[in-house]
Amino acid sequence: MTGIPPPSRFPEQPIPPWRRAVLKVGSSLLAADGGGLSPRFALDLAHFVSANITAGRQLVIVSSGAVAAGRALIPPLPESGGALAARQALAALGQAQLIALWQRFFDRPVAQVLLTHDDLRNRRRYLNARATLRELLHLGTLPVVNENDTVSVDELKLGDNDNLAAIVAALIDAQALFIATDIDGLYTTDPRHHPDAQPLHEVRTLTPEHLAMAGDSSSTGGTGGMRTKLEAALKAGAAGIDTYLFNGRSSDVVRGLAQHRLRGTRIHPTCTPIAARKYWLRHAPVEPGAILIDAGAAAALAQQGASLLPGGVLSAEGDFRRGDMIQITTRSPDHPSHPLARGLVQYSAADVRRIAGCHSRDIQTLLGYTYGDTIVHRDDLVLL
């Protein structure tokens, strides 16, 4: 078997500006020697994270390694193909080790976020996960996300953390997804077996041919190989997010990332973030019912791109729940209720009726709880 070609085969290219990103780190980097977690490669990645946070950007880490860490604590246990219960036990043992590894690199709090398939399939839990991640970023913490292998069952698993990283990137409206691998980027074939493999430093449009190039190889100790990384790039690209594949074992490559230089593969999105988001908002099913707003609120939404606040609400129709897609209407000379916009509502119909016309600061007093100042946030709203 031949060695991996050096990173210099990939020309250096600039990384466009971004303000929010996800970094995915796999087991092959955190447990490279098969003997549990090691800071060997994680330290360089931590420097990349710190440099960007210091510059005012926001980052979420999606990190594998819990099962590998657990396996090192109680050897020998079945490999990754073993019983589900054994794997879940290993994840429970190793997750604390994984968070401790990341915390040692940072002088800011590291937040553990464990997600399951149901958290992302159920709209309300999806919104709660998004709100939690956004708040953690707002507080200046570093969220470290992993799939909750301790409770996930095979038929409801997200499958791999490449896929999870793409979902999280869309969840937080990221502009970039960085996937650290144990290979330099995408090649025309596996460079570990074919010395004539050619590097692909930029992919404008991912095709079935690219997936075929990646094959079905998987990295040692994990569940995802290059094919799953390309599938994640497809998912991220559908949300307007750039994906960057790079060698996380190369200090030079990782240091270059901190200076917005990539030696690896850039995979372009299939649409812009705005187009992807607005398309989903415009075409998702709408629940029965609507919120009627006054002329001032209508002007703020239509002309200023504002969020919908309770002060501009006149009434709520129907029995919608928090997280539902609802219609926002206003009065016109010809119609008592004219469709203006649609969006994801932060409060139920019953709650909206109670806080209609009030100031946002009074929500807590009127309801006894609050989900924020807005009824429909501008990021969750599209004009018709």
UniProtKB/Swiss-Prot annotation:
Catalyzes the transfer of a phosphate group to glutamate to form L-glutamate 5-phosphate. ATP binds at K24, T181, D182, T223, G224, G225, M226, R227, T228, K229. It catalyses: L-glutamate + ATP = L-glutamyl 5-phosphate + ADP. Pathway: Amino-acid biosynthesis; L-proline biosynthesis; L-glutamate 5-semialdehyde from L-glutamate: step 1/2. PANTHER family: GLUTAMATE 5-KINASE, ISOPENTENYL PHOSPHATE KINASE. Substrate binds at S64, D149, N161. This is Glutamate 5-kinase. Keywords: Amino-acid biosynthesis, ATP-binding, Cytoplasm, Kinase, Nucleotide-binding, Proline biosynthesis, Transferase. It comes from Xylella fastidiosa (strain M12). Its EC number is 2.7.2.11. Belongs to the glutamate 5-kinase family. Residues 288-370 form the PUA domain. GO terms for molecular function: ATP binding; glutamate 5-kinase activity; RNA binding. It is found in: Cytoplasm. Pfam families: AA_kinase, PUA. Gene3D superfamilies: Acetylglutamate kinase-like, PUA domain.
